[in-house]
Amino acid sequence: MNGRIFRDFSAKTIGGVVAEIREKMQSLTKYTYEIILVNDCSPDDTFDVIRKLALEDPKITAIDFVRNFGQHSALMAGLRQSAGDIVICLDDDGQTPADEADKLLEALENGADVAYARYAHKKHSLFRNFGSYVNEKMAEVMLDKPKTLYVSSYFATKRYIVDDMIRYENSYPYVIGLVLRATKNIVNVDINHRNREVGESGYTLKKLLGLWMNGFTSFSVKPLRIATIFGVISALAGFIYGIVIIIQHFVLPDRVMGFASLAAILVFFGGMIMIMLGLIGEYVGRIYISMNRSPQYIIKQIVKKEDVSEQNSDKQT
């Protein structure tokens, strides 16, 4: 059985993380492994560092994107490059302990298709924790995620799940949605959460909103159904209010109908209509982009020691 681990990194933390992965995987003697490092166009010299690591170790593959495509596109690139029976995905901030990967592997050996790390005490910022909470709740509503299941960026999955995930070619990948679509045999494993080694989380409110929109419009039609329900409720409310106005006109003929209430109603229903049109437009726009085959990511280069060795050998001959 092969254990495969990949992640994207910061140049300041990569050396220690790779060393930790090596040490842990070498202690698990029944596994062979490879490390796939995906550079999602980091602003520092990350790719120079991981390129050097790849040239020194045949077990390491370095992937460099042309531009920033986002975490989920980077994960898809790593999944497609992997070849093992098991794939373990880690985040890039040093907070996910690679030395506890054996806990995830054990869960898969016990029959699970996917094992997600669950943190008893998360050491993210208050904003990141709030974003994670909202993401959990929205996934429960939109993607039918079980309430007892905690999803995180640190997880292990079996090969047949990976094979199903990488068949997804639409422009907006959402890994959680792909996992939930593929299997319900998912478990949580308690893992310690570390303090962030360098910098701050790259997730801003804009990125979180974009991630939620990607996931829920790509893997669920529930937003459209919710919009339909709101439309029906609004129409009924408007109809009832119209009846009330007619009754008041006959019961209280001297009463002057207020312009303010009419304006408020128009603004409310106008806002509802614009929201629904925007939601429909989002779906139509994504269909259009997918039909144009907009790529999930563009790889600038892939570096492997064996490939470089073969090229040098060809030049010598």
Predicted segments, located by residue:
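Short, well-formed alpha-helical segments that are part of the catalytic scaffolds
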Residues: 9-26
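Hydrophobic helical membrane-anchoring modules
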Residues: 12, 174-317
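Acidic helix N-cap motif at the loop->helix transition within catalytic regions
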Residues: 12-15, 44-53
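Short beta-strand/loop segment that forms part of the nucleotide-sugar
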Residues: 18, 29-41, 63-64
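Short aromatic/hydrophobic "clamp" motif used to bind/position activated sugar donors
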Residues: 87
